Each structure stands twice: as structure tokens, then as C-alpha cells.
Curated annotation (Swiss-Prot):
Gene3D superfamilies (alphabetical): 3.30.70.3270
Binding site for [4Fe-4S] cluster 2: 70, 99, 102, 105
Subunit structure: NDH-1 is composed of 14 different subunits. Subunits NuoA, H, J, K, L, M, N constitute the membrane sector of the complex.
Gene: nuoI
Name of this chain's protein: NADH-quinone oxidoreductase subunit I
GO biological process assignments: aerobic respiration
Origin superkingdom: Bacteria
Alphabetized InterPro entries for the sequence: 4Fe4S_Fe-S-bd (IPR017896), 4Fe4S_Fe_S_CS (IPR017900), NADH_quinone_OxRdtase_chainI (IPR010226)
Amino acid sequence: MINYLKSFFLYEIVRGMALTLKYFFKPKVTINYPYEKSPISPRFKGEHALRRYEHGEERCIACKLCEAICPAQAIVIEADEREDGSRRTTRYDIDMTKCIYCGLCQEACPVDAIVEGPNFEFASLTHTALIYDKERLLQNGDRWEQALASKLHKDYEYR
């Protein structure tokens, strides 16, 4: 009987309209994405990058810790030894379609060579465009070096 009276007096509709009026005059919580962007957390894990030292040499020492720790097996590294005895990578590939953006590669790196940058807009129409080689990763690092360095500096005490 109570349900009949509620439906007779349009209780559900009145309740729904009251809820609509309650939120009608509050500020919007959505953003117009391509034109407006929300702030990104300092610990955001986006597109990968390889960093260089200030004098231009790449930081990666080919220890392969990032390749070993990657749970998705998205990283492939090949390395050669130089005349001075140091090791450097000849091939450093990341398959971004396999990557789960966990950040373990960044945590495992002893020299902060591989980092996850601030970019989240790197969609592609082909699978091959999402397999990043060493040159692409170094270009990403060069492009975002200031942002990456400040991000690592802010996060240093928590590492």
C-alpha cells in the first residue's frame, strides 16, 4: 500500500528532481579534455624515457636490472663492452603495448637512466609505433630532462 501511495504522488520523480536541483548550482567537476587538462601527480607514470648525463653521454650502464625486473617482459636490452671496459647498450627496446606502467624498471635502475615521464598522450594507430627503440627513448629524455630531473629531486627522499 505504501509503494502504491508513493508512486501515486510521484515520490520517485520528486526525489530525483530534488537531487537534480541540489547539484544543478554546484560547480562542474568535469573538464573539456583536449582543451583543458587536470594537474598531474608528481609520481605519475607515463611515457618512458632514457636520460643522459650533463655532458651528453647516456646514463644506462647496461646492467639489465630493468629487463630482469619487468613483470610484463616488455624490455629487451643488448649490450657490448667498450674499449675502456664499460658496458653500454646497443639495443634498448620497450614494447609499450606490453608495459603495465608499474614503475619497477625505474626503481631498479641504479643510475636513474630509465624513467617514466609526464607524457600520457602517445596513442598510435599501429603496433610498431608503440615499440620504442633506444633513439626514441633518448629523444623523450632530452625533451623532458628538466621535468624529469625536478620530479626525481622531489621524490628523492621517498626512494
